[in-house]
């Protein structure tokens, strides 16, 4: 069974991330050239995320362009909070919600094929979605971005942080292979409908499994 670790994902949310180690293609050597290759992949991931209002669509494009699954469809693997789950005050403020207005918290791993590409904490105001949208979120593993696509939403980014860079690397690393940590990039954002009304706040942490498509050095890179 795959091991998991807990990692804070901002605000008071907690996401479950796959343990790091071995997600990058086995055998990718720890050289300047290969670290540069990984850095380019991280930068490409950031550009993909920054140019899509929907993280779901961004990850499906990423999964498809890097041939990471036969069917590049992202599904939301739900996680159940194990303790008290109060809505952070900052989320209520960002969403313009009163202290008594219902806000739901959906915590998921976004999965494409066998790859857990991100973990996401999503607080949303059910009164600002349709009844069908709420039923789908409650009863299926559909990703949030697909469910609320009919709102024609935009993304107001509040945070976008690179959590790890392969460059220049540690001079004390003697393992001989590049081993990213579990967390690569994090973003926090408010989603707004076509009228500009906020309906959701998300904290998304993108994992080292976004890089698992990278091949070990081969003839294409040897010359």
Task: Please report, for each region that a protein language model flagged, where it lies by residue.
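Positively charged n-region of N-terminal signal peptides that target proteins for export
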Residues: 1-4
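Bacterial N-terminal signal peptides
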Residues: 7-19
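Generic secondary-structure boundary signal with a strong preference for alpha-helix termini
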Residues: 19-22, 208
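N-terminal domain-onset segments
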Residues: 22-105, 109-111, 115-169, 175-180, ...
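Low-complexity, intrinsically disordered Gly/Pro/Thr-rich segments
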Residues: 185-192
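Surface-exposed flexible segments
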Residues: 203-209
């Amino acid at each position: 069974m795959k091991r998991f670790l807990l990692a804070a994902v901002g605000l008071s949310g907690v996401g479950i991330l796959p343990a790091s180690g071995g997600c990058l293609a086995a055998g990718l050597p720890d050289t300047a050239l290969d670290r540069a290759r990984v850095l380019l992949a991280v930068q490409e991931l950031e550009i993909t995320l920054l140019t899509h209002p929907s993280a779901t669509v961004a990850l499906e494009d990423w999964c498809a362009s890097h041939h990471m699954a036969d069917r590049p469809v992202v599904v939301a693997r739900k996680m159940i909070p194990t303790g008290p789950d109060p809505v952070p005050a900052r989320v209520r403020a960002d969403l313009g919600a009163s202290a008594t207005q219902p806000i739901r918290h959906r915590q998921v791993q976004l999965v494409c094929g066998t790859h857990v590409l991100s973990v996401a904490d999503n607080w949303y105001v059910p009164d600002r979605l349709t009844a069908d949208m709420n039923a789908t979120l409650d009863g299926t593993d559909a990703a949030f971005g697909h469910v609320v696509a009919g709102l024609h939403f935009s993304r107001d980014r509040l945070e976008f942080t690179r959590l790890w860079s392969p460059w220049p690397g540690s001079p004390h690393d003697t393992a001989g292979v590049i081993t990213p940590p579990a967390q690569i990039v994090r973003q926090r954002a408010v989603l707004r409908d076509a009228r500009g009304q906020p309906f959701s706040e998300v904290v998304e942490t993108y994992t080292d499994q976004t890089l698992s498509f990278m091949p070990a050095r081969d003839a294409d890179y040897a010359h």
